Structures are given as structure tokens and as C-alpha cells.
Regions:
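N-terminal Rossmann NAD(P)H-binding glycine-rich loop of SDR-like oxidoreductase domains
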Residues: 41-58
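Substrate-positioning beta->alpha
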Residues: 204-209, 222-245, 251, 331
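N-terminal secretory signal peptides and thylakoid transit peptides that target proteins
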Residues: 1-19
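Mid/C-terminal beta-alpha module of Rossmann-like enzyme folds, strongest
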Residues: 243-317, 334-337, 344-371
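Short-chain dehydrogenase/reductase
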Residues: 146-177, 230-231
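NAD(P)-cofactor binding segment of oxidoreductase domains
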Residues: 99-155, 177
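Conserved Rossmann-fold cofactor-binding substructure of NAD(P)-dependent oxidoreductases
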Residues: 82-100
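Conserved beta-loop-beta element that borders a ligand/cofactor-binding pocket
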Residues: 176-200
Length: 372
């Protein structure tokens, strides 16, 4: 079943403006042997800036194309072409006409007509089109067998011409993939990320858990320690995307870390916090009876036998074999917490995901009464 974008959007558009993203990749970054001319369609949201920064650090010549409305102060040293992804709005794509690049990285495509317009316009003047899709473009992506591969069929819509992204975000991405492939056969890289997390993720879906561990005390641990969870650090995703362009890899890739035990993830959150947080494991059916549901209040978790468990157990073997590198969960937790704690106090006080403190206390009390 398709999931509404309002319920689950895998890449956040919320982003705090900055002129650069120094130091987020750690250590010195080797320069690419052959610098490329790379055009970014978008590049100023959440994933885009991380990818732009890594491409710059690798020595590539980067151009940004967007409307010039979001985080316009970012990357002042780069060439910026102002336009609109929709060729029917304002100056449309006219700023791209007559130009050539080695590769395009499209982080802002949501409607097949619009993705097709850019891919067709650039088909004779770029060598490779890398499109950022989503893991939820697959048919019945929430359900089904665990560790499904890129061979799983795409989702379909009764009306593939719809442009209602808020309702059909997931399966519209599947049609965007098809549009890009039709314009540039055998020259498209389809990147299908799972939940994108890390520094500058303003959704708080990942961040809630380590920050809750920081608070200490008794903490709800939904389900069982053996349930599985899965995500991708935005920096690992960015590095793999640039790697695909540098190596001219044209394939479909699920880009997620290998599924890990849920208990291991929560233990890592507590260890990183060095707090007195203690886990109280509560079955999913009890939590549901008390208004706590997977991917609503309980982000990143689903019971192993829940209809949504397939969302957290995709295979990333193809991407790993192609060069995807996954940093330790402890590093993602540490850096995300450090970023979050650098935000203004009023923002930190308004966690955007997770269980409200009073609700957690209420459910814990009900659980202990039930156990008694």
C-alpha cells in the first residue's frame, strides 16, 4: 500500500541555512583523479548540501540550478543558475540551454513530467544522470519479504499523470525513474535511500532516540531487542552518490546501512549519552492500545510481524559491493547529537518526532500496572 508523504517522507527538505558544511566528512578528503563538471538540480535542502560539499572537497566543478529561494546564502563561491524545474513556470529550464556537464545530480525531482523535462533537455549534453529516488518507490514497500533487492517491482498508480506529491510521493518517484531512463537509456543512476539521518536532519526521527537517552531515566523501548532497524547517514549517502558519478556507475541502488538489531541501536544511544537511561521493553500491541504507533510516535521501529516491518529491512548488498561505505552507528549518533545541541534552545525544546515526555510517563505507568 502506498504511504502518504505526510506520514513518511524519506528525505527531509527542512534545513538550516549555512555558507558551507566544513568538517562533516571527517579528516582530509583526497582529490579526485579527474575533476568533473557536475550540475546539481536542487542542492540546498538536506541531502543536497552534503553532496555538494563533498563534490567540492573532491575537487569537482559544481554548478547549482534552483529557484534561488532556499538557503540562498550557501556556497557563494559556486556558479548558480536561477530557474524553475517546471518548464512551464517562469523562465523554466532556459538557463541550462547550450551548456554541457559531465554529470547531473538530481536531488529535487518529485514529478515525472518535470524530471523528464530536465533529462530530455540535457540528454545530449551530459554523460550521466543520477536521480535520487527513494526506497518507498517499490510496490508494497512496507510489507513483504525481508532483505528485498533492487529487482523488486516498482509501485504503480491508477493515474500516473497525477502530480499530487503530498499523496503519492513514493510511487511518483517510481515514475520519475522511468522518465529519466526514457530520456537517457543506460546512462541513469537510480539512488534509492532509506531513512536519511545525521547532522542537519530537522525531522528528528533519528535524533529523538539519542536525545531521549541523554535525558536519562526509564525509557520506553518498543517491541523486542531482536526487531530490526535501518537508515542511511546523509554523509555516507552523499559520498556514494559522488562515487557513482566518478566511477560512471549506472545501475539501481538501494542505499541503506545493513539492518541492525533494534536493541543494539538503543544500547548505542545510551552508551553515547553516558546517561542513566534504562530500557523498559513493551510489546507493540500494548503500545498501539495506548496510542503509540510505528512511524508515528515510534520512529525507526516496527514489530517484526507488523505489516510495516518491510520498510526497515531492505538489502543494500549491491551498493556495498559497488563502494558504499557505512560509518559506525556510534559516529552517526555522536555527530547528530552534537549538531542538535548546537541549535537554539527553543528549537531543542520542541522535538519534532518521538514520544512526548508526559505521554511516555503515562504509558510506562500503565505498563507497570498491567504487569502487576
Amino acid at each position: 500500500m502506498p504511504l502518504n508523504r505526510r506520514d513518511f517522507v524519506l528525505s527531509s527538505a527542512a534545513f538550516a541555512g549555512t555558507a558551507a558544511l566544513p568538517g562533516l566528512f571527517g579528516g582530509s578528503i583526497a582529490r579526485a583523479q579527474q575533476p568533473l563538471r557536475i550540475l546539481f538540480l536542487g542542492g540546498t535542502g538536506f541531502l543536497g548540501p552534503h553532496t555538494v560539499q563533498y563534490a567540492i572537497d573532491r575537487g569537482h566543478d559544481v554548478t547549482l540550478f534552483n529557484r534561488g529561494r532556499t538557503n540562498n546564502d550557501m556556497f557563494p563561491e559556486l556558479e548558480k543558475i536561477v530557474g524553475n524545474r517546471d518548464p512551464e513556470v517562469d523562465q523554466g529550464l532556459s538557463g541550462l540551454e547550450g551548456r554541457e556537464w559531465d554529470a547531473v545530480i538530481d536531488t529535487s525531482g518529485y514529478v515525472p513530467r518535470i524530471v523528464g523535462a530536465s533529462a530530455n533537455l540535457l540528454s545530449d549534453r551530459v554523460g550521466q544522470y543520477l536521480f535520487v529516488s527513494t526506497i518507498c518507490q517499490y510496490n508494497d514497500w512496507l510489507e513483504g519479504d525481508k532483505f528485498r533487492t533492487e529487482d523488486w517491482p516498482r509501485g504503480t498508480l491508477e493515474d500516473p499523470t497525477t502530480e499530487d506529491v503530498s499523496t503519492h510521493y513514493c510511487y511518483l518517484k517510481a515514475y520519475c525513474e522511468i522518465a529519466a531512463e526514457a530520456a537517457m537509456p543506460d546512462r541513469v543512476t537510480q539512488i534509492r535511500p532509506g531513512l536519511i539521518v545525521g547532522p542537519r536532519d530537522n525531522t528528528d526521527r533519528f535524533t529523538y532516540w539519542p536525545m531521549r537517552a541523554e535525558r536519562g531515566g526509564e525509557m520506553i523501548a518498543p517491541g523486542r531487542p531482536t526487531d530490526l532497524t535501518q537508515y542511511i547517514d546523509v554523509r555516507d549517502l552523499a559520498m556514494f552518490m559522488v562515487h557513482c558519478v566518478e566511477q560512471k556507475l549506472t545501475d539501481d541502488f538501494n542505499v541503506v546501512r545493513q539492518a541492525m538489531p533494534w536493541g543494539e541501536f538503543l544500547d548505542a544511544c545510551i552508551s553515547a549519552a553516558d546517561s542513566d537511561a534504562s530500557l523498559t521493553w513493551i510489546p507493540g500491541d500494548f503500545l498501539s492500545e495506548h496510542g503509540l504507533e510505528p512511524w508515528q510516535q515510534l520512529q525507526m521501529w516496527s514489530d517484526a510481524d507488523h505489516p510495516m516491518s518491510g520498510s526497515l529491512t531492505w538489502s543494500s548488498a549491491r551498493a556495498i559491493n559497488a563502494g558504499l561505505r557505512i560509518r559506525p552507528v556510534e559516529e552517526t549518533i555522536r555527530d547528530t547529537v552534537a549538531w542538535y545541541q548546537s541549535l537554539p534552545a527553543d528549537r531543542q525544546a520542541e522535538m519534532r518526532s518521538g514520544i512526548a515526555a508526559d505521554k511516555e510517563a503515562e504509558v510506562l505507568a500503565a505498563w507497570h500496572e498491567h504487569q502487576a
